[in-house]
Amino acid sequence: MFRIIKWLIALPVGIFIFFNAYVYGNIITYRAVAPHQTAFMSMRMKQFEQEGRDVALDYRWMPYNRISVNLKKALIASEDARFAGHGGFDWGGIQNAIRRNRNSGKVKAGGSTISQQLAKNLFLNESRSYIRKGEEAAITAMMEAVTDKDRIFELYLNSIEWHYGVFGAEAASRYFYQIPAAKLTKQQAAKLTARVPAPLYYADHPKSKRLRNKTNIVLRRMGSAELPESDTD
């Protein structure tokens, strides 16, 4: 009996250690190498297949300096205004999210920073639970410890979901505007950014009033967006 209890304790601990070692190894690799495909992309494409959707993956890696500053500012203004200065976590946002979750009785709001969103995109799925948020936090801490802000943002820009099968700034720019990501205007960048919280909803509701309103909000906030140091020169 005691041996069984030991195994019941040791097995999940071993899985946890192995998973985090795997993640850390990939984080080190991704400092210099572009991901072939993220866990979220794989999950999403499998979901489309199960739903009987004929969707092809459109994912085109683009270096950081070949992505429009307009898009960078729009995303920071919308998703994580304190990105340039925090260590991966927006504690005020997390506290607000916890309060909203308590009030609703469910894990809805996440208070996720760009770094946390990237952790989810690279290694996790879209399930919502406190265990998954804990995994996300651990990955975020590891990533922030060994990866500079420009690289974190570059990985994020290239892994965002924008439409059915469309991932990354370059694929989105080509899909919606038939131009490279480097040439996105402020208006185009704001429109793309407005889709980020719910890309598949807006894919099905392209004339949504919420999408127009969010675009205008992003446009107003872009001027005060603070980019990582290398983009401020």
Region locations from a protein language model:
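Juxtamembrane regions of bacterial inner-membrane/periplasmic proteins
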Residues: 1-233
